[in-house]
Amino acid sequence: LTIMLILWHIIYIKFTLPLKSKKALKNDKADRCGLTNGVLTEKEQIQMTKDLNHKILDCTIRDGGLVNNWDFSVKMVQDMYAGLSEAGVEYMEVGYKNSAKLLKGADAGPWRFLNEDFLKEVIKTKTDTKLSALVDIGRVDENDILPREQSHLDMIRVATYIKDVDKALELVNKFNSYGYETSINIMALSHVMENELTEAFEDIAKSPVDVVYVVDSYGSMDNRDVDYMVTKFQNLLPNKKLGLHMHNNMQLAFANTLVGASKGVEFLDASVFGMGRAAGNCPTELLVSYLKNPRYEIRPVLDLIERHLIPMREKVEWGYIIPYMVAGVLNEHPRAGMALRSSADKDKYVEFYDKLTSPEAMPTNHHSD
């Protein structure tokens, strides 16, 4: 009997336990993604509910265009829409709806100045993934905007600096009357005074805008900053949905996005492989794989990276690079870092740091994407 018990114990340890451990690991991963019927704690249930309310807005084509002058092939944009749709991403920002007549850059790709007929030729059949475009104050011709029922676009986002919020809200009112979902994205928040923000919120609260964005234009915010900003927005704009647009200068875009998400921010901006101006954005593939929403699938996003983003990354540069880190730490626009990376001295980081921290350094010019 003793020998039989010993043999049974050996068999259990050698064969049965490893199988249970593998199954446990698999179930743990499934539970994290909300794919099993296991019993969840109250905290997990609350988090799952929040995750199900989140919406990912992928801005690869729009923000990534700042890297390659919007030189995306029709095939890539079609693949992006199909892939993001398969991945369960709720919105794809397909470019800017600015006017070439009001802005230099006629040599830019078509996603810089979206044309409705062209967009309908590229994306012939829409899916559940909605399409958005972004406009800048003073750069959009309102006559170019069709009523929503005549457009492929579902959402128009208005980017503005704090001084132009009144002009942004005029556009929001018009786009809202056309039937579009709308957002207002207040840029360079890390340079905005408290009283300016409070005054702007009074007008925003009375407007029909659907979503108000916390935008970390310079990639200078940390988790405490995001927590503070989101709380302020929630307190002063209780009836508005909130969004987050983070930059990755200090390797915090994903972490900061999760901070906002945990506080109930609904719209989360991201881009495939993090493609975006300078240090780039929160990677779509991270959000899709992390959020506990069974609608999200990581495989189609990995396919997009493999087929399109890897080859593109060999031609143009974005992501965490020291000059952009320095700009983020100093709460400065990355334009100086972008100029450095385009020069023969692109890796002279100490000289760059000394230049930006010298008393003669010019203050940040706010007018920029």
Predicted regions and their residues:
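Aromatic (phenylalanine/tyrosine) cluster motif
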Residues: 12-15
